[in-house]
């Protein structure tokens, strides 16, 4: 969306959910309560996927009026997001497809349907598909980079599974820190964006421990 407030938050290491809560509730970052942050987090993820005031109210157990105020406050805070959503739908209506950051297409034949329910689903996909699809593009590029580096280094460690934005490895103990450096470098620098890609790592005898 190239929203200035979001870019500033990500580039300065500010927790976006806390920042959203701070602006919506008109309090300082330090005064944001866990409940405020929880509501802001739900709004951050829900609104971009087209959640309604009623849907947000149901999810947060608040009134529809409060739900609408949260959504209105969100768009006032992040006008770039609203612009992105509107432009994504408009472009999809003209082309009947949307594209990811690497140019993969998601065709939306129902975007101009006369059926409001069918059309609404296509409109939500017009907004969501470039986001989710671009995330998929980025992690797949990172996986290619990592596999190439593992082979170049002749490591015994192996990449074994991808789960959403997470990669799991079977890591030989002697290669622990080399693998960490290799993986982090590939994932954080595989593509240049207007905000940093940051990675956290963990080790353990099983997936649970690694978290």
Question: Model-derived features: where do they sit?
Answer:
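Conserved catalytic core of nucleotide polymerization and phosphodiester-bond processing enzymes
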Residues: 1-211
């Amino acid at each position: 969306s190239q929203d200035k407030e979001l870019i500033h938050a990500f580039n300065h290491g500010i927790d976006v959910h806390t920042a959203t809560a701070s602006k919506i509730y008109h309090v300082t970052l330090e005064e944001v309560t866990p409940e405020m942050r929880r509501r802001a987090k739900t709004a951050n993820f829900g609104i971009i996927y087209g959640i309604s005031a009623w849907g947000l109210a149901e999810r947060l157990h608040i009134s529809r009026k409060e739900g609408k105020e949260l959504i209105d406050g969100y768009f006032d805070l992040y006008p770039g997001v609203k612009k992105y959503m509107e432009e994504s739908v408009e472009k999809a209506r003209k082309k009947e497809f949307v594209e990811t950051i690497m140019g993969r297409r998601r065709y939306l034949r129902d975007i101009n349907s006369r059926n409001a329910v069918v059309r609404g689903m296509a409109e939500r996909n017009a907004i969501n598909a470039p986001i989710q699809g671009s995330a998929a593009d980025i992690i797949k590029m990172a996986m290619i980079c990592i596999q190439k580096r593992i082979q170049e280094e002749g490591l015994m460690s192996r990449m074994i599974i991808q789960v959403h934005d997470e990669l799991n490895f079977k890591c030989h103990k002697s290669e622990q820190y080399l693998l960490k450096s290799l993986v982090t470098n590939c994932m954080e620098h595989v593509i240049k964006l207007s905000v940093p890609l940051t990675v956290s790592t963990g080790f353990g005898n099983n997936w649970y421990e690694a978290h």
